[in-house]
């Protein structure tokens, strides 16, 4: 898998996260990779979904998107679709950036102006409804979850959570939409120990009554022995 960027080509980039993501993606799925960065999840999920499925990669940063497009061209040209939008609860434009790290750029800060789209807006524009969403939005995840629950789609969701307030907002909205929310091991530890939040650990949200998928997720290293929120 040819990629640029130190650490990505080693096969050791966020191994536990991508093990869990691989469990929730199947042949024929429509995957939305929201906050695609350089495309590691895009490349992996494109291989899993095969020609029967599709991957739609959302990356608002011009610089990140240039690497993403390069990686798609090298590895899965014609099978992954790169879109220049941030997702949130409304359509419009917003400031974007606010960090020297390409992995920590977010809405509402920075010097770059980017296009923002709602999930319903993207569906109206002809993007096929997702069966799986992977989200890493640097603190805007609750806005994306709000957009999701306002829409008519109910995909399986894997979402990076950047602080406890985002966890509470996302969990409340997902419960209202009848999702079961599984915290990863690090989130469960933060909650059990009442310790300071660190990093961007994940949740997986499943439409209720999908016990088979829940069991598969619960056997991964990241979600083993956790209790639903």
Summary of predicted features, one role per range:
Residues 10-30, 90-152, 164-169, 173:
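Short internal loop-to-helix segment that lines adenine-nucleotide cofactor pockets
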Residues 165-187:
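C-terminal substrate-binding/active-site "lid" region of AdoMet-derived donor-dependent transferases
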Residues 1-71, 75-79, 110, 123-126, ...:
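S-adenosyl-L-methionine
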Residues 154-162:
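Conserved beta-strand signature within the Rossmann-like core of class I S-adenosyl-L-methionine
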Residues 59, 139, 161:
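Conserved residues at beta->alpha junctions
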Residues 31, 35, 133, 157:
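Receiver (REC) domain switch-region micro-motif
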């Amino acid at each position: 898998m040819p990629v640029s960027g130190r650490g990505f080509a080693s096969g050791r980039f966020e191994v536990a996260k991508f093990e869990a993501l691989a469990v929730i993606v199947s042949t024929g799925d429509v995957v939305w990779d929201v906050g695609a960065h350089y495309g590691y999840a895009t490349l992996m999920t494109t291989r899993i979904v095969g020609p029967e499925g599709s991957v739609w990669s959302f990356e608002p940063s011009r610089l990140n998107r240039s690497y993403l497009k390069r990686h798609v061209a090298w590895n899965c040209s014609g099978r992954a679709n790169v879109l220049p939008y941030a997702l949130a609860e409304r359509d419009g434009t917003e400031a974007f950036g606010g960090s020297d790290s390409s992995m920590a750029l977010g809405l509402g800060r920075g010097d770059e102006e980017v296009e923002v789209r709602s999930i319903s807006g993207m569906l109206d524009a002809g993007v096929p409804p997702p069966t799986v969403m992977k989200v890493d939005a640097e603190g805007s995840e609750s806005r994306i979850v709000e957009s999701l629950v306002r829409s008519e789609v109910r995909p399986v969701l894997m979402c990076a959570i950047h602080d406890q307030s985002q966890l509470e907002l996302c969990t409340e909205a997902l419960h209202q939409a009848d999702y079961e929310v599984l915290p990863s091991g690090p989130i469960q530890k933060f909650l059990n120990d009442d310790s300071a939040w660190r990093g961007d650990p994940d949740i997986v949200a499943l439409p209720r009554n999908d016990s088979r998928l829940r069991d598969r997720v619960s056997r991964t290293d990241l979600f083993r022995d956790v209790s639903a929120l």
